[in-house]
Amino acid sequence: MGDFAATITIDQPVDTVFAFLADPSNLPLWLEAVDGVAFDDTPARRGARFRIVRSLPGGRVVNEVALVDFEPEHRVTFESRTGPTPFRYEYRLDRTGHNTRITLVGRISAEGL
C-alpha cells in the first residue's frame, strides 16, 4: 500500500467545492485516469455505490466504489470495493476566509496489476 497526502487551496466557497467533490460524475473532470462513471445508487450520500472505469498502465479496469464518509462541507471519502487497485481517498475541506482548503489523505495499492 502507498499512503500519501496533498493539500490545495481553491478560490471557491466550501459549499461549492464540496458539491463538486461529492458528485462522482465529476471524477473524469479532475482525475486523469478516470474515463467514466456508472451509478448503482443515487450519488452524493453516505453508502452510495458507483463504478468507475480507469485507464491504467495494464489496460482499462473497473472499480466498484462506495462513498463511505459524507459530511457536507467537511469531508467526503471514496473507497474501492473491487478492482485490481484498492484505494481509499479522503477529502477534508476547511473554510479559509472565502476560499476552501482541501486535504487529500489517500491510500492505494497496485497489488492486482
What are these regions (language model features)?
Residues 45, 51, 64, 90, ...:
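C-terminal and inter-domain tail/linker signature
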Residues 1-46:
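Hydrophobic ligand-binding cavity/cleft-lining segments
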Residues 14-15, 42-45, 68-73, 92-101:
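A short, structured loop/turn motif at beta-sheet edges
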Residues 3-5, 60-64, 86-90:
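Short, surface-exposed coil-to-beta transition loops
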Residues 55-61, 110-113:
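Short, cysteine-centered beta-strand-loop-beta hairpins and adjacent loop/turn segments enriched
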Residues 38, 65-69, 79:
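A short, surface-exposed loop/turn module that caps and links secondary-structure elements
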Residues 49-55, 76-82:
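Short beta-strand segments that buttress and anchor functional surface loops
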Residues 81-113:
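Beta-strand/loop substructures that line and gate deep hydrophobic ligand-binding cavities in soluble
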